[in-house]
């Protein structure tokens, strides 16, 4: 009986130890390979000089902006992005009738303004939107990027200020 228990104990010990030993050896080999790659000066130089993709080049997430059942028969026409309505600055333009929404607002993009929506720069002219309106940003020295529900000011040149004017 003693020999049977001893042999079962040794077999159990082997069954537990052998996978642990193989795992340890595999981890050790992978660690050495990783360290060898990370110690390579050419690889480090390539990593430092690598350029990252700009935001507009990242995969685009498509949102279904159709809320016809919630907003009546016309639906929201200005929901997903600004809609160009004129070439001139028409301050009194009625965006509420175009967008079928009383919250719709008008804003103007001047000839030297750079506003980017979904990776496309807006042309000069007046726009209607039900999203936020770009404000408090120095449009002469910055690019305005529109994301899902807000505008972000990014300075074209880091020496200039991109925030509020005045």
UniProtKB/Swiss-Prot annotation:
It comes from Xestia c-nigrum granulosis virus (XnGV). This is Uncharacterized ORF22 homolog. It comes from the Viruses. It holds the Pfam family PIF2. The lineage of its organism: Viruses, Viruses incertae sedis, Naldaviricetes, Lefavirales, Baculoviridae.
